[in-house]
Design a protein with these regions (language model features):
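Short, solvent-exposed secondary-structure boundary motifs
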Residues: 3, 44, 96-98
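Histidine-acidic residue clusters that define the catalytic metal-binding segment
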Residues: 90-92
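Predominantly transmembrane beta-strands of Gram-negative outer membrane beta-barrel pores used
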Residues: 1-42, 49-57, 65-69
């Protein structure tokens, strides 16, 4: 099914894959950049996102679900616009770009009043900010900000759920690993000009 809205166009669908599997998906693409440009705004946002789900029923007791989500945000500057207020905003607003996705799989087994689930997932976020003095990208000497930050997390979880009359008992274990990196270059102008240039790398394990 295709949809057309005031700020986006979308596509979605669902159905069967053979006798044991079903699928569901949707995707959206905005055209906000065109609308914001017509309105004379100094920033032009745009996004694309999509999601998909597949469920496979191996038997009455066993099933597998796979889920994926993804998105891209991209905001660029409308340097064609003039005016004191617009030029002030353009002087400090950076260009932003962000990509993110999450993918996971969950296997579930039903055993009477009990159900066991094992889930594996991974998420990713990439954030980038860039700014040039006077929005002039013709020379790296004009670069005042370049930020690159990436966050990732991988998780493995096992769980048992038991229905005991009026009570539900749930127990489980989880292991996760998170990884973060940041590379930042910043040139600033105050009483004395200077630069800030650093890298960060961090890994965390949790359970």
């Amino acid at each position: 099914k295709a949809t057309l809205g005031a700020s986006e166009v979308g596509l979605s669908g669902s159905g069967h894959i053979g006798e044991k599997a079903t699928f569901l998906f949707s995707a959206r693409q905005s055209y906000l950049q065109m609308l914001f440009k017509l309105l004379g705004l100094p920033f032009l946002p745009n996004y694309i996102d999509a999601q998909a789900k597949v469920r496979i029923r191996f038997s009455q007791r066993d099933e597998l679900t796979v889920l994926a989500l993804a998105g891209i945000d991209n905001m660029r500057l409308n340097t064609d616009e003039k005016g004191e207020e617009t030029e002030y905003l353009l002087s400090y607003l950076p260009r932003l770009r962000q990509e993110t996705f999450t993918v996971g799989a969950s296997y579930r087994h039903y055993a009477g009043r009990h159900a066991q689930t094992v889930t594996l997932s991974h998420s990713y976020l990439n954030n980038r900010n860039t700014k040039y003095l006077g929005n002039d990208e013709s020379s790296e000497d004009n670069l005042t900000l370049r930020l690159r930050a990436v966050e990732q997390k991988t998780s493995l979880r096992a769980e048992n759920r038991s229905h005991l009359g009026r009570w539900t008992l749930r127990e489980g274990v989880e292991l996760s690993y998170s990884h973060y990196t940041n590379r930042t270059f910043r040139r600033f102008f105050a009483e004395q000009a200077g630069t800030l240039n650093y890298r960060t790398r961090l890994g965390l394990t949790g359970w």
